């Protein structure tokens, strides 16, 4: 599980230095938790193969990443072309999202489906959304409908929906509780994910 030390990695100066710590310290935690999420998904959707990915930030040549993430998708060679699950970390929180980023192939179809779903009624109030995977800013679930409409109208728009856990909770005392909440987050998002996979 994540610890306070993992959040401090985002204070390290320099691309190479920060990436070295991300690889050695954060990515093993992604793998540990990610395998549990993968097992949960495979059990719930037994007729589908799922693959675990870790963001490598290979395109970066100067600026160190302000966040990093892992992903679960049905594609062996990538994840951004379809709706997928993400487990990631910023300097002040950890998140799990159902993500549609970087112009997935069925972006318009996803948007049409989501604008007609009563997503706010399908999820508990502690769910939040992100409109840009490169920014830490999040919005309440009440902003979902507007963001879903934008996903269909603006080519470069993005939509992520899920939960976050503030860094203060990662003191080692709540690890099992946080993991249970993460697995339950996948459970709540699954009905939406399954509908997206059908379009």
From Swiss-Prot:
Lineage top rank: taxon:
Bacteria
InterPro entries cross-referenced by the UniProt entry: UPF0637 (IPR009403), UPF0637_domain_sf (IPR053707)
SUPFAM superfamilies annotated for this entry? YktB/PF0168-like (SSF142913)
Q: Which Gene3D superfamilies match?
A: Protein of unknown function DUF1054
Annotated coiled-coil segments of the chain: none
Regarding protein family, the annotation reads: Belongs to the UPF0637 family.
- Full protein name: UPF0637 protein LACR_1918
Task: Say which species the protein is native to.
Answer: Lactococcus lactis subsp. cremoris (strain SK11)
